[in-house]
Amino acid sequence: MADDWESAADSEVVIRPTAAASVNKWEGEDEDEDIKDSWEDEEEKKDEEKPTKTEAPAKPKPNKALKAKLEQQALLEEEAEAKRLANLSPAEKLAEKLRLQKIQEASDLKHAQEAFGVTSTCGGLDAFNPETKEEFKEFGATLSWKVGQFRESEHFPQFVEDLVRSLCVNLSAADIKKVKMNVEILHSEKLKLEKANAKKPAGKGKGKVTLRTENDDIDGYQKYGNDFTEDYDDFM
């Protein structure tokens, strides 16, 4: 009996095939999106790492209005100065002329000191304390320039004669001989120039003959600093 039941049970048992695992059609979507996001992040990083080009600052344009205003202001100042000078009395004009001359002389002295490397300007000639050859050259150049300012005076030739005599008193006979030779050379050159200028007919427009200053016999005289200006030939 029991065997019949087992047979019947076996016959009734139906073995059903195992259902295949269900496939999710959306599976893997998230992985693709993650990969895509990582690519985009890398691209953004590359863009950030690229150096940004700095634009050169634009050159400032010239202000034409300001330039014109400054020119107009300068013109007005010149006109005002001209009117002021026109209204001056003869005495005031003379004082103004002397004032401008003093300013010009101070400017010339400054340029002379700069040309000869003179750095100390306080105290004028008293500020000099020459010891070396170069320092004496600087001192001589400044002194020559100062003395030469008065060359137009009628008393200037006598002043130079007395000055040379007083300076040579402290020299030895050999040194005085050198000074004498240099003065004689200068005298000879001056005579030649004066004769050449006297022979020239007037009205031809040729320049006046001047004393030669290079490769001549008066280089020794010029070493004492007396070649400071081109027109210093009148010093002696």
Swiss-Prot record:
Role played? Component of the eukaryotic translation initiation factor 3 (eIF-3) complex, which is involved in protein synthesis of a specialized repertoire of mRNAs and, together with other initiation factors, stimulates binding of mRNA and methionyl-tRNAi to the 40S ribosome. The eIF-3 complex specifically targets and initiates translation of a subset of mRNAs involved in cell proliferation.
Domain of life according to the entry: Eukaryota
Q: Which family does it belong to?
A: Belongs to the eIF-3 subunit J family.
Q: Where is the composition biased (Acidic residues)?
A: 28-46
Q: For the region Disordered, what residue ranges are annotated?
A: 1-65
Q: What protein name applies here?
A: Eukaryotic translation initiation factor 3 subunit J
**Pfam families the UniProt entry points to:** eIF3_subunit
Which PANTHER family does its entry note? EUKARYOTIC TRANSLATION INITIATION FACTOR 3 SUBUNIT J
Known partners and oligomeric status: Component of the eukaryotic translation initiation factor 3 (eIF-3) complex. The eIF-3 complex interacts with pix.
